[in-house]
From Swiss-Prot:
Protein family according to the UniProt entry: Belongs to the glyceraldehyde-3-phosphate dehydrogenase family.
Record site feature (Activates thiol group during catalysis), residues: 177
Protein name: Glyceraldehyde-3-phosphate dehydrogenase C
GO biological processes: glucose metabolic process; glycolytic process
Lineage of the species this protein comes from: Bacteria, Pseudomonadati, Pseudomonadota, Gammaproteobacteria, Enterobacterales
Catalytic function, reaction form: D-glyceraldehyde 3-phosphate + phosphate + NAD(+) = (2R)-3-phospho-glyceroyl phosphate + NADH + H(+)
Amino acid sequence: MSKVGINGFGRIGRLVLRRLLEVKSNIDVVAINDLTSPKILAYLLKHDSNYGPFPWSVDFTEDSLIVDGKSIAVYAEKEAKNIPWKAKGAEIIVECTGFYTSAEKSQAHLDAGAKKVLISAPAGEMKTIVYKVNDDTLDGNDTIVSVASCTTNCLAPMAKALHDSFGIEVGTMTTIHAYTGTQSLVDGPRGKDLRASRAAAENIIPHTTGAAKAIGLVIPELSGKLKGHAQRVPVKTGSVTELVSILGKKVTAEEVNNALKQATTNNESFGYTDEEIVSSDIIGSHFGSVFDATQTEITAVGDLQLVKTVAWYDNEYGFVTQLIRTLEKFAKL
């Protein structure tokens, strides 16, 4: 059984623990580092506005959480290098703060006694894994790995299936993304991004995304071929990605749907639907990406075709299911 520490017990960190318990994983969470008190961490773990009550017992002491009868140490170190991971035997750290998003920064966890780090965010030019797309590139020499973003985990399976079947020449993607904790609840200053200062629950807010760029780290042959941006919208979770691409051959919508359906066969990470679902239907999905065959469109001008494909994703829970799959494989190497 591999022992794991979680750095950052926010939306993703708490769902990591929840999902590990749900799948009865051999991963054992032995320590959590977060600047919030154990009392508040226990409360937020127990009560989740998106996914409902935590199904296991939760209690706390001044320096631990007691989850399903098991004690998990809680630290409150500002600097990763000072976290006593070694004291609890934490071998792999799931980095969920959003601050240690590079190999150089995450090295601090290794210096503190851990053996490996899995970063739950894009982390620059380093090994980046989307499970069932390029997880076969993981090997025993890897010590710090990124699982990219929720949007990359949605886009990558769809882009790979299209590219494998027809070849992608160039494309642009838009994610219609649920608001997140990095946005403002009401209008107010929020760094240098003017639009980020506007109320998340009241506006459609144009936003940046690194998902298209990160595709090149996951599928090297698509490096530089995709561009993308995001529109943040007033939903709590449940997002959708639209990819418009020029392919290497002429296709019909039926051919595209058949190819994508084939790619989802026996694939725990990439799902398929031909039902007319909406964003709330994807909440709690165990897939990182769900292709929507009802939204495939082909627009032709002369010999040029624009091919629109769409995939849904739960940007919190679906992403975490992907993270856990990668974590379990990472732990075995």
